[in-house]
């Protein structure tokens, strides 16, 4: 679950911190209030495309940081597969320092590639805008949602059933 967003020197934002609560969080406001800028900041932190003109005018660098609260076993496995250590308190911090023409991505303080952040972010967050509900039309997404809902114990059972099936098929 996304706990907080920290943005510094991006577009019109000098520096801001947004804390998110349990459950559903909704961004509302008048046109031009900055809702899209906040969502764009999240996308940047998740490895989205960065252009130099996204920096606040007159600034050399910017920063976007996301803090997630997550103790899901799949996440810990993914971190280990990337040679990264999960934090002791169950948080995952994704950060991206943006400067003229380049950026530095980090997961829990370790420098990583934008591709690695994108891979990890698939386990952390799902952002939907207007008319973006089409992901529910993909059968693969159905299984991902059901597997996430069922939990780790079910995944272990499904793995055992699969192994037994392959044993029987080999006979």
Predicted segments with their positions:
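Gly/Lys-enriched N-terminal cap/neck module of very large, oligomeric protein machines
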Residues: 4-7, 11-145, 149-166
């Amino acid at each position: 679950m996304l706990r907080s967003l920290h943005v510094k020197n991006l577009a019109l934002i000098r520096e801001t911190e947004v804390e998110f609560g349990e459950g559903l969080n909704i961004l509302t406001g008048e046109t031009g209030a900055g809702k899209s800028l906040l969502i764009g900041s999240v996308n940047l932190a998740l490895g989205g495309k960065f252009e130099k003109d996204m920096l606040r005018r007159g600034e050399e660098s910017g920063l976007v940081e996301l803090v997630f609260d997550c103790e899901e076993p799949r996440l810990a496995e993914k971190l280990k597969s990337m040679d990264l250590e999960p934090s002791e308190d169950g948080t995952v911090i994704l950060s991206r320092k943006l400067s003229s023409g380049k950026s530095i991505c980090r997961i829990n303080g370790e420098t990583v590639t934008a591709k690695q952040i994108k891979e990890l972010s698939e386990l952390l967050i799902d952002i939907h805008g207007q008319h973006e509900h089409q992901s529910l039309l993909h059968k693969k997404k159905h299984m991902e949602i059901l597997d996430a809902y069922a939990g780790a114990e079910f995944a272990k059972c499904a793995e055992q059933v699969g192994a037994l099936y392959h044993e029987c098929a080999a006979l």
